[in-house]
Amino acid sequence: MNLSHLNTGSMKSNTGVSMKDVGILVLGHGSTLPYNKELVESLAQMIGKNHTGPVRTAYLNMNLPDIQAGLKSFEGTNVNKIVALPLFLAHGVHTRQDIPQELGVDPEKRRGILNIWGEEVEVICAEPLGVDECIAALACKRAEEALR
């Protein structure tokens, strides 16, 4: 799938923040099946191709690194913001409660200033993937593949 239209690497966010100063923490649920972790890591690598800042992975359950270790993995990268990006389709207890709690941010505001490695860093919890044309196109592709 061509993601070139999503390239934000050299762009600034609508708040004027340089994206190279923003880390992305890709969050997977975690699983005892190794494929789950491989999938999350592969998607994080793809995201990294479209983002100039560092991209890391972490897992809510069963896999390492856990979310706290994932946050700490940005030490030395000079990021001043970390966006936690849950690879979940829709909101549920994990995105509303568990992930914000593990991140140490207010579940309502979904963001907070944390002292992670002796420096204050803003941590922002992104929304789940939700409804999007890209996901609909991927679903259609998977349906077509099932017919082969």
List the predicted regions and their residue ranges.
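Active-site-proximal alpha-helix that buttresses catalytic centers in soluble enzyme cores
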Residues: 2-148
